[in-house]
Amino acid sequence: MRQTRLILRLVAGIVLLVVLDGPALAQAPLSVKVGVLPIVPMTPFRTAEKLGLFKEEGLEVKPEMFQGGAVALPALLNKQVDITYSNWVSVAQLAQQGGKLKVIAGGTASWSKPPDAGTILVGRDSDIKSVKDLPGKTIGFNTLRSIERASVMQVLKNNGIDPASVKYVEVPWPNQADAHKQGSIQALTVIEPFQSRYVNQMGFRVLAYFYPEGWKVSVPLAGWTVMQEWLAEHKEHARRFARGLERAVQYLRQNPAEERKLMEEFFKLPKLVVDGIVVNDYSVKVDAAGAQIVLDALVEDGMLKGKVNFAELLHDTAK
């Protein structure tokens, strides 16, 4: 009898340990490697990191920095990262080439009217006074397979200019001022925080806000993309990631003054530059119809070989 009671106590103890440890095991953080860029649209991601919102969702994020979305996507294909930020032009081009991608969250959308977080800049004393002076000139782009280039081409067409009359070259955002000084480019294309830095610190002049002047409506610009193969086995990772971002977006909307302080910290910028930053609209949900406007124009411009149905790229967390 005594032995029986001892066995029962041991069994009860094991059951109790399982009950107590079960939730802890279930709540163990999931881990994801995330490709990030040195740009203001990263603010919700960085905010979710700093405030522990991903951690509260049971997600451990491991960021890896890339120059641009077109560079980050190959890292996604090579499984160097699980999730990466990229513009929809690069995503659509890769999808058309056979890349099995899914969008799990949006990033930013442009405004329908200036000012906006994307500009063509020229030197303060440049003889380029308007967009109509750009034919024959060379424009620098962070990456050529980008929504920035697509938008600039649209601006040119809206002004009656053949996009082929302008030369496009790749120059990383941080190097465009030097390239301009050396004369290898006559105009820059930048987004924030480079836009504010070049205008407010270095005296460059805004020639055009290429998103609203190109598309005339608000369009989604970029967001978070994964491989379909990865998503099939990590839907919970995607859900927690999108939820952490959404909480960060809501926090930033409710605390605009805090947002500027966070940008100053995240991007190591002086207050003068941070105060001049134009912030585009954050949105975890993606306007598929707006993105389709851009992608359809790319077919006409030759940047896409045929129609890409953007809605088919969206995972439930981005709809």
Question: Language model features by range: what are they?
Answer:
Residues 231-305:
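Secondary-structure end/capping motifs
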Residues 89, 168-169, 174-262:
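Pocket-lining segment of extracytoplasmic ligand-binding domains
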Residues 51-52, 74, 78, 92, ...:
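Solvent-exposed, polar/charged alpha-helical surfaces in well-ordered, non-transmembrane soluble domains
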Residues 9-21:
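Bacterial N-terminal signal peptides
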Residues 298-319:
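Conserved C-terminal helix/tail region of periplasmic/extracytoplasmic solute-binding proteins
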